[in-house]
Amino acid sequence: MKRIAIISPSGKFYGSEQVLFDFLCTTQHKYVIYVPEGTFYDKIKNQGVHTPHLFTSVKKLYLHLAWMLLCGEFDGIYINEGGHIKYLNLLASLFPNKNFYVHIRLLEDCSAARLRKMHKNVSYISISDYITTEVKQNTGIQCYTMYDIYKLSSGIAGIKEFRIENDIVRLGIVGRLTTTKGLYDISHFCNYCENNQTKVHLEFHFFGGIDNHISEVKDFVVKAGTYKNINCKFHGFVNDKKQIY
């Protein structure tokens, strides 16, 4: 097995960290994980299976990783979000025989300005077909959609007919309410549902922090309170997915 170091730029325990932690809880392999101090580090340490290393300086971290790659300690590096792409691209240039992987999560990471030059030894992955398409359209770079372990639908024919049995349809939207996480599309969809009344009543349940300091976010929350045909409920960040259900 190739020795892949894992980098988590955030030490918090939000969506991408929860997905990564679920993987770490189910994999049969052991990994070295570099992560800032925080909840995520504590969870990995308490799990007692993998080896977490704290870092406080991004530049020092990548100098250390360069040395580890040079010494042959790692065969590659996986980064759990796109914020460190420029550092990873530098390592990819210095070590063309090593493999590098980036999990693209946000729209802001799909731009040509962020991804820059494509390297043959860098692979971009996502768990969203929407993000995958954005990367391809904006940069021409191939991005691969990885279907997560919870979905058995990969390779299985989809449902041919979809019927709604209840008068109320509840839609859960998980993630921080902000402009980089699809606020524009959410707002337009809510407006469409409000202006095109259907036989069923729609409830939108938002689970995640709200960036009220951003004017577009604040305006949407205010407008959501004026809807008559749909109902929007903001629950804030939840610590456990069981709370959602």
Located regions from the model:
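A conserved mid-protein helix/loop that constitutes part of the nucleotide-sugar donor-binding site
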Residues: 14-22, 178-195
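Conserved active-site histidine-acidic residue motif and adjacent donor-binding/catalytic loop
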Residues: 56-60, 231-245
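Conserved donor-binding/catalytic core segment of Leloir-type glycosyltransferases
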Residues: 5-7, 163-181, 187-190, 204-205
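Donor nucleotide-sugar binding/catalytic pocket of nucleotide-sugar-dependent glycosyltransferases
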Residues: 121-157
